């Protein structure tokens, strides 16, 4: 595996490749990330991964400085998973001058849910993903369903900007107790880690209620919010939305069997966790 930091060197290395599969990450790789690499290999060759902790998608009070950086461990894991090139640029490589041009998602998708609680987050994501796509020129790119809203925004962005990249969705990988794998799980204390699976269990109860015929979605959302709060969580949102556009479904759409997803974000101690389940 080649480890490259220079954009020009990356382009030189990939010149002539027309089936590249790309997996962008921020590093601190776990089994969830590695499952993306394996899925990428099913859809293209060679597989290119990137590791870049993107300052643009962190808010002023978020964890950019303490976000775990484990490059040497990550390199070993990628080598074991047959990745052809790791693009690991420095901040100077990616942003040699102030990034004045940004890619802004529409408010109806980028300003809700995560976008409401993390202003500027999706503009940072879209900007860096567009720049990475320009560098790698992949045929396909793999994103995880765990970041459901991000997946939808990136997919729509590629469609609307006519980027010739197929976005592949990868299923969320969970620990044995149901907790969705995340680099931020390492922030949890021992007691918090024991409590953390309750987020997924709460979403499962919401899903089961909807599948069982409950149509008062607002009541389900509030019950889930209250349940987590009573256990010491601080929920940002629990929302049942249409999979197609993350808009709340109408009564008619519910009766017609509109595909739904329940999404949640909540703090447990100092750690903010997100999760979702399709319904």
Swiss-Prot record:
Organism lineage: Bacteria, Pseudomonadati, Pseudomonadota, Betaproteobacteria, Burkholderiales
Residues engaged in binding ATP: 26-33, 144-147, 173, 181-184
Protein name: Pantothenate synthetase
Binding-site positions, beta-alanine: 57
Major location category of this protein: cytoplasm
Locations listed in the record: Cytoplasm
Domain of life, source organism: Bacteria
Family, per entry: Belongs to the pantothenate synthetase family.
GO CC aspect terms: cytosol
Organism: Burkholderia orbicola (strain MC0-3)
GO molecular function: ATP binding; pantoate-beta-alanine ligase activity
């Amino acid at each position: 595996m080649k480890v490259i930091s220079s954009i020009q060197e990356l382009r030189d290395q990939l010149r002539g490749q027309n089936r590249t599969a790309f997996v962008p990450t921020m590093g601190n790789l776990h089994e969830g990330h590695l499952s993306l690499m394996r899925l990428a290999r099913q859809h293209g060759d060679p597989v290119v991964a990137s590791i870049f902790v993107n300052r643009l998608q962190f808010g002023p009070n978020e964890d950019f400085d303490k976000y775990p950086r484990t490059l040497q461990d990550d390199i070993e894991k990628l080598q074991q998973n047959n990745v052809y090139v790791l693009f690991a640029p420095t901040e100077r490589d990616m942003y040699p001058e102030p990034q004045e041009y940004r890619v802004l998602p529409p408010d109806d998708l980028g300003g809700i849910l995560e976008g409401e609680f993390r202003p500027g987050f999706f503009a940072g994501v879209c900007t860096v993903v567009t720049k990475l796509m320009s560098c790698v020129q992949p045929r396909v790119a793999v994103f995880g369903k765990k970041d459901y809203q991000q997946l939808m925004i990136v997919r729509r962005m590629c469609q609307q900007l006519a980027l010739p990249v197929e976005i592949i969705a990868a299923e969320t990988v969970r620990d044995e107790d149901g907790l969705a794998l995340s680099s931020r799980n390492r922030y949890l204390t021992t007691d918090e880690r024991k409590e953390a699976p309750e987020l997924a269990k709460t979403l499962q109860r919401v899903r089961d209620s909807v599948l069982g015929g409950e149509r008062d979605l607002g009541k389900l959302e509030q019950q889930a919010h209250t349940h987590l709060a009573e256990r010491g969580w601080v929920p940002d949102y629990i929302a049942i939305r249409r999979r197609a556009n993350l808009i709340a479904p109408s009564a008619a759409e519910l009766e017609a069997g509109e595909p739904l997803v329940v999404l949640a974000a909540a703090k447990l101690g100092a750690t903010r966790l997100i999760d979702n389940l399709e319904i």
